[in-house]
Regions:
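Active-site neighborhood of phospho(di)ester-bond hydrolases with catalytic His/Asp-centered motifs
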Residues: 207-209
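Conserved phosphate/anionic-ligand binding catalytic regions in large, soluble enzymes, centered on
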Residues: 23
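Short acidic/histidine-rich active-site segments
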Residues: 211-215, 233
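Alpha/beta enzyme core
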Residues: 6-12, 16, 26-52, 59-77, ...
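Basic/polar N-terminal segments that are highly enriched at the extreme N-terminus
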Residues: 1-4
Length: 245
């Protein structure tokens, strides 16, 4: 197969009404696990790392990662998760990432637009796709992906304006999920009506669901049917991995 930019992969997902799993890795074991599981299921895959994970593995790791992904038996993407600065994104691009996320969601709306525009300008010049975020994802525990204590839901009326002004390729939206492991007894509930409103206004824009761990399978399924084309998963499978060490 080949190492694609995410725009190419999510375009197919959008046209065929499915979502691609995106899995955070922080070492060669998790990288191997994610790729081999995707191959065993004949499923496309997005391998992603947040900046703290990039720091942990070091730049030399990405020669291995890009080579393995180029030779994967399924379509694959190497994606930067929750880059906070232009420098985060440039480092990823130089290391062979085919997609980057610039997360300016905690900035003002106009500052977020300006930051996203700058990253889009740089990334698109070298055929790298860009994910951005409006609204804020929650955080249930310390996580490399970040998050905030109080979720700010994405405003549907802002999505079309943000997309047109930035030229982004995909958008992470906040509809009630959180990064990390949910406390025992806590049952998250997605605001699917917010997703419906966003999808109605921007039907061609690939939408991304962060904090996918521990949500009900049926809710995730419904979200995918209603316009989500990328689902981020980290905490669930990391918990299973570390429980066996």
């Amino acid at each position: 197969m080949m190492l694609l930019n995410m725009n190419e992969l999510l375009k197919v997902a959008k046209e065929n009404h499915f979502a691609v799993g995106a899995f955070n890795v922080c070492d060669s074991v998790l990288l191997k696990t994610v790729i081999e599981t995707a191959e065993a299921n004949n499923a496309p895959v997005i391998v992603e790392l947040a900046p703290p994970e990039v720091d942990f593995v070091g730049d030399e790791f990405f020669q291995l990662a890009t080579e393995r992904l180029r030779n994967a038996k399924v379509p694959a993407v190497l994606h930067l998760d929750h880059g906070k600065t232009v420098e985060d994104c440039v480092r990823a691009i130089r290391n062979g990432f085919t997609s980057v996320m610039i997360d300016g969601s905690e900035l003002s709306y106009e500052e977020n637009i300006a930051l996203t525009q700058r990253v889009v300008e740089i990334a698109h010049a070298v055929n790298v796709s860009v994910e951005a975020e409006i609204g804020t994802i929650g955080a249930m525990s310390d996580s490399v992906e970040g998050g905030v204590e109080n979720i700010t839901y994405t405003k549907p009326e802002e999505v079309e304006d943000f997309s047109q002004r930035t030229g982004l390729d995909s958008l992470a939206i906040a509809i009630g999920t959180a990064h990390g492991i949910y406390p025992t007894g806590f049952v998250p509930e997605l605001k699917l009506e917010v997703l419906d409103a966003i999808h109605q206004l921007t039907p061609d824009l690939p939408l991304v669901l962060h904090g996918g761990s521990s949500n009900k399978d049926e809710e995730i399924h419904q979200a995918c049917l209603r316009g989500i084309n990328k689902v981020n998963i980290a905490s669930d499978y990391r918990k299973a991995f570390f429980s066996q060490l």
